[in-house]
């Protein structure tokens, strides 16, 4: 009798997990979930282009899931860029660039992936966001195209709805993107070389 009860409970729990993972999820990630970046920026000017597609981006990693991260990623990465550059303008297109001797950076989302407990048999939800940063100088010459992956997962999805779990994983992924941008941007060799050239030109003038 005891074994029968355990079997029934286990079956009910498995059904609950499967049902939760197979349901649809429309996720809206809010800006308020991200703290202000505290970082000392370098004496570099940059024009950051967040175009309409980026600002309004809604990921559809599968036919049952949509994740609206447009405003959240604009806010999060905008804060991170402010921690990198002492002089910054956030604009919507290259036509609005007003700085000279500056970096012009256009972020874009290449891919968003989601993994649920039904995919991995683990009690976690995971989100991967693959960013690309197109980096030019103010004359329109390309400096680099930098690939920046970000990852987030829930510590435990038990007692979370599918929508809430994916939202939590997406928030962690966006925070990961902001942290990587702050830590790794000036380690890009082409950025370092550009800064050296600009410094030499400034010394010659």
Go through each PLM region and give its residues.
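Surface-exposed short loop/turn segments
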Residues: 23-30, 93-145, 154-158
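Bacterial N-terminal signal peptides that target proteins for export
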Residues: 1-10
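Mid-chain, structured segments of secreted extracytoplasmic proteins
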Residues: 72-97, 107
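Sec-exported extracytoplasmic/periplasmic mature domains
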Residues: 81-86, 90, 178-190
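Short secondary-structure boundary motifs at beta->alpha junctions and helix caps
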Residues: 62-69, 139-186
